[in-house]
Amino acid sequence: MKKIKCALIGPGNIGTDLLAKLQRSPVLEPVWMVGIDPASDGLKRASEMGIKTTAEGVDGLIPHMKADGVQIVFDATSAYVHAENSAKVNAQGAMMIDLTPAAIGPYCVPPVNLKQHVGRREMNVNMVTCGGQATIPMVYAVSRVQPVAYGEIVATVSSRSVGPGTRKNIDEFTRTTAGAVEKVGGARQGKAIIIINPAEPPLIMRDTVHCLVEGKPDEAAITQSIHDMIREVQKYVPGYKLVNGPVFDGQRVSVFMEVEGLGDYLPKYAGNLDIMTAAAARTAEMFAEEILKGELVLEPVAA
């Protein structure tokens, strides 16, 4: 079976976890890992796996992309450098899957809107944030039953799973997640809160979703919709589970989730890495399948 070749930019927690997932993919083959620090653990690991590496940033990758047939690039760096990375990669005729909160391309939350991205020839799609991937399916599960006037999500993650890039991007994280709670989740107004918990041993990712619906909540239909959506997310993140809810209090619907990872890079408490990387891999696989079928031909985009 032919595979589509990929490159990863950013050998941190997210990039390293994503690499493990891509190595199991039936349609994607990771061939490059790009960093900026020659001593980085992520670059060392990639190199040991036989993957080509560069510590010269994206500029170290660009000259090799055509020769190595790289068609999909994942950016797991920081919102601040993403636009520049994306322009350089798109100019080489490769598409970009953005795992930073830069959000210059359309948001993608696979169980909600992945199919809408098929056939649109997008050269950049944004995976929102780990908090967004964990909670937006729940907001959407409510909003597809009845209108949501306000959606609020709280993502609690272990300090150890949050690397320096994510810490620098906290403001972008909350803005991008809130924007996607509205655009993808369907809430008229969205709010996002992230809590980084320093407890040791590290705590598993926890997510709380509150929705204020219009009118009296249709409890049976909302409950059914939430359980259906959880099954969809579990197809690619088996550790996604409902801890409590949906709890109905007047017009408020609350759902309490927990996300356990597969333990590919950081231990299982870091479900925030998994939900992000599994969603990105799932998205890339869909585009790769289109390319393999000849339905999607990527073309260079003038920078």
UniProtKB/Swiss-Prot annotation:
Alphabetized CDD domains for the sequence: ALDH_C (cd23933)
Substrates-to-products reaction catalysed: acetaldehyde + NAD(+) + CoA = acetyl-CoA + NADH + H(+)
Known EC number: 1.2.1.10
Gene3D superfamilies recorded: Dihydrodipicolinate Reductase, domain 2, NAD(P)-binding Rossmann-like Domain
UniProt keyword Oxidoreductase present: yes
Chain segments annotated as transmembrane: none
Keyword Oxidoreductase assigned: yes
UniProt xrefs under Pfam families: AcetDehyd-dimer, Semialdhyde_dh
GO MF annotations in UniProt: acetaldehyde dehydrogenase (acetylating) activity; NAD binding
Active site: 130 (acyl-thioester intermediate)
Residues binding NAD(+): 161-169, 272
Highest taxon of the lineage: Bacteria
Entry keywords, A to Z: Aromatic hydrocarbons catabolism, NAD, Oxidoreductase
SMART domains reported in the protein's UniProt record: Semialdhyde_dh (SM00859)
GO BP annotations listed: catabolic process
Family: Belongs to the acetaldehyde dehydrogenase family.
Protein name per UniProt: Acetaldehyde dehydrogenase
